[in-house]
């Protein structure tokens, strides 16, 4: 059994920055300005002129939050570079490329438009450590050190941010790579990649059909994108496309659709890209980093290729930490977060998509034959809500868990973890016998309900 504890309680930062419903709780202009002031003070070190890169997705509230962040950063003496709508990995890239002290992405990823979030990146383009976020939290609740009028920062928009990122995307595949033979449906979720992803794929030669490229401030992730696949599945089949590419609101995750309209998740994509990298002696670390939620089938497949699967707790930040400490250059999540460290410092759905398209072209085979690299082991996840207490500490629940492990008899996996944001226990089991998997999950869920 793999069981996670709850994260250390923090007032502002969660597992992926600060996130919430706009104009409530921590997601207000006032809090955004204080975050900017605290982060600006923290990163305002050295004698050089300090700067921050700010990008956003297409949410209506993005303009409001951007203005608050600009006010906060400039008030503590930092210059601001505004990119406009741009994917999260592009903001991370430009932060490093433009020698900025800090990068900020305004996005709530795959959440509906009512939510928004603030993600921070250090000068190296990587997300901040827990220690740095805690230091910034302390600054948020302290009095800001406002600078004299003559030292207030300046703000400017750069017009070529999209072009810079498109160039970097094309550099992530070989110079000989062309997609002339492919007809590709690209779904950008009416989000941050609505201009850059179709352009990059088209510039590499593909015929493209676009979905989710008409953002209006309120339609991000609404019936389109990697969490709403009906439209792209239907379009791929109706248009006779070779493949579909579905991104989420900030384009840090990817789900692929084969020519038959079947979805291909992050586990299959990781398996495909990792084996192609291994064939070219480009894979580092001897395998792939994924979370405890990745399918056992991926682990068995990699093992058959003499590669290993290193597991972490859920969250792409934990995947990235293990990649950095273990020398890996590919990792991700079943949900579609894909980190290719040779080309990006955070999850980048478009970079991963280009790798998938290159593999498809080089194979000369249909996507349905190329993308489904392993047989999935039956897997079931259920969420159980509870009221008060700690149900996982109850003897009755521990007995149910022990019975489940005994029933699986080493031929499956059991993952039980509390949610870090709500009173929910997540129960996942997988094994070769689908009926047995369902039985053990239901038994544990019943025990949690009774204990709660």
Swiss-Prot record:
Task: Note how many cofactor molecules are bound and how.
Answer: Binds 1 Mg(2+) ion per subunit.
List the Pfam families hit by this protein, alphabetically.
Answer: PGM_PMM_I, PGM_PMM_II, PGM_PMM_III, PGM_PMM_IV
Instruction: Write out the residues that bind Mg(2+).
Output: 109, 248, 250, 252
Q: Which residues form the signal peptide?
A: none
Residues with the Phosphoserine modification:
109
User: Which UniProt keywords are listed?
Assistant: Isomerase, Magnesium, Metal-binding, Phosphoprotein
Q: Which GO terms describe its cellular component?
A: cytosol
Report the transmembrane regions from the record.
none
The family this protein is said to belong to: Belongs to the phosphohexose mutase family.
Q: What role does this protein play?
A: Catalyzes the conversion of glucosamine-6-phosphate to glucosamine-1-phosphate.
**Name of the featured protein:** Phosphoglucosamine mutase
**Could you tell me which species this protein originates from?**
Erythrobacter litoralis (strain HTCC2594)
């Amino acid at each position: 059994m793999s069981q996670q504890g709850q994260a250390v309680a923090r007032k502002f930062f969660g597992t992926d920055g600060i996130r919430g419903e706009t104009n409530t709780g921590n997601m207000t202009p006032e809090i955004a300005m204080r975050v900017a002031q605290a982060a600006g003070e923290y990163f305002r070190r050295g004698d050089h002129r300090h700067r921050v890169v700010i990008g956003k997705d297409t949410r209506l509230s993005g303009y409001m939050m951007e203005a608050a962040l600009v006010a906060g950063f400039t008030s503590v003496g930092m210059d601001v570079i505004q990119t406009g709508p741009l994917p999260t990995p592009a903001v991370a890239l430009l932060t490093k490329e433009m020698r900025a002290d800090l990068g900020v992405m305004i996005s709530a990823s795959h959440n509906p438009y009512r939510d928004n979030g603030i993600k921070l990146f250090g000068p190296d383009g990587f997300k901040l450590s827990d220690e740095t976020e805690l230091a910034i939290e302390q600054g948020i609740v302290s009095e800001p050190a406002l600078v004299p009028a003559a030292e207030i920062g300046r703000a400017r928009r750069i017009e070529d941010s999209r072009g810079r990122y498109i160039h970097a995307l094309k550099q992530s595949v070989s110079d000989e790579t062309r997609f002339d033979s492919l007809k590709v449906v690209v779904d950008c979720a009416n989000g941050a990649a609505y201009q850059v992803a179709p352009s990059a794929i088209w510039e590499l030669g593909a015929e493209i059909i676009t979905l989710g490229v008409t953002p209006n401030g309120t339609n991000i992730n609404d019936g389109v994108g990697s969490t709403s696949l009906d439209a792209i599945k239907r379009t791929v089949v109706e248009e006779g496309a070779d493949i579909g590419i579905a991104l989420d609101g900030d384009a840090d995750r990817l789900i692929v659709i084969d020519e038959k309209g079947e979805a291909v998740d992050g586990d299959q994509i990781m398996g495909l890209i990792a084996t192609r990298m291994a064939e070219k002696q480009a894979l580092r670390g001897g395998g792939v980093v994924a979370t405890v939620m990745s399918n056992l089938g991926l682990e068995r497949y990699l093992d058959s290729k003499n590669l290993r699967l290193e597991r972490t707790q859920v969250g792409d930040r934990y995947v990235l930490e293990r990649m950095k400490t273990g020398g890996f250059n590919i990792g991700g999540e079943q949900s579609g977060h894909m980190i290719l460290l040779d080309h990006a410092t955070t999850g980048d759905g478009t970079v991963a998509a280009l790798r998938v398209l290159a593999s498809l072209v080089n194979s000369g085979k249909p996507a349905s034959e190329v993308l489904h690299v392993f047989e999935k082991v039956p897997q079931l996840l259920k969420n159980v809500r509870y009221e008060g207490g700690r149900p996982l500490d109850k003897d009755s629940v521990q007995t149910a868990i022990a019975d489940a492990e005994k029933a699986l008899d080493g031929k499956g996996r059991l993952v039980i973890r509390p949610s870090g944001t709500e009173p929910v226990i997540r129960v996942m089991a997988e094994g070769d016998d689908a009926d047995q998997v369902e039985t053990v999950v239901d038994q544990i869920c019943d025990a949690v309900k009774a204990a709660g």
